[in-house]
């Protein structure tokens, strides 16, 4: 089992390449983006030292499926998926914020709430809430998009408008799309016996139109609970059975790592890497309702290059 942790392609018309935490994005002629979902994994804004076999394929295929399932809600950037790990799409000018939407109080929002804070991103929260409790209505809690190595910061709607990161009309559209996409994602998850707990969306503009970009409803951008037993676990104050990257974060925390300065990433043994890969496959199959078909990983970079070249030459 091989994992793709770095890419160095040179496609026809390539103007630039951006290496993100997980994806490598190639700009073709200033018109299209070739986005490669690598097998890198990040947590606490740090890229971990080992790649996770098949993770890129899973992320790319889940995102493609949900982009196709939401085109009636808003336009999105996807044009094609010429390789299981690649999406080619329209080049958009991204808004410098991530639209995070939460249906339940958990993760970083719970950690903030537990510390006594009752307002997140300008959204006031009532007293007396418990971990993993459902909000009466989903809340939107945006963050800034940090440069590599820096942490994303919470930001309120007021601050976004004040800093000119979006106009009032644009922000209204972003929020409307965010809530509608989350509603659709929640409905699809429910059909599979899952709860979509929280997720994030990224948007950009192309020719004056706002497009949904990047990934959607993947285990890297979302948190899912199993609905079966949710209520019982909640009432007993027990941890929920979840499908997300949270299990990676928990493993890191148990081993003394939270992304803080001076902390060392614990060794990722082959068994840990295998278990993370297995969890991702479990999530893929649960959320799509389809069997995961492992692609040939004998020479991933060569396969991607061939498939993308074929697509671009059309």
From Swiss-Prot:
Gene Ontology biological-process annotations: 'de novo' IMP biosynthetic process
Keywords from the named record: ATP-binding, Ligase, Nucleotide-binding, Purine biosynthesis
EC category: ligase
Molecular function, one GO term: phosphoribosylaminoimidazolesuccinocarboxamide synthase activity
Alphabetical list of InterPro entries matching this protein: SAICAR_synt/ADE2_N, SAICAR_synthetase_CS
Pfam family, one: SAICAR_synt
Keyword RNA-binding set for record: no
EC numbers: 6.3.2.6
Reaction catalysed by this enzyme: 5-amino-1-(5-phospho-D-ribosyl)imidazole-4-carboxylate + L-aspartate + ATP = (2S)-2-[5-amino-1-(5-phospho-beta-D-ribosyl)imidazole-4-carboxamido]succinate + ADP + phosphate + 2 H(+)
Biological pathway: Purine metabolism; IMP biosynthesis via de novo pathway; 5-amino-1-(5-phospho-D-ribosyl)imidazole-4-carboxamide from 5-amino-1-(5-phospho-D-ribosyl)imidazole-4-carboxylate: step 1/2
Family: Belongs to the SAICAR synthetase family.
Xref: NCBIfam families: PRK12607.1 (NF009251), PRK13961.1 (NF010568)
The protein, known as: Phosphoribosylaminoimidazole-succinocarboxamide synthase
Gene that encodes the chain: purC
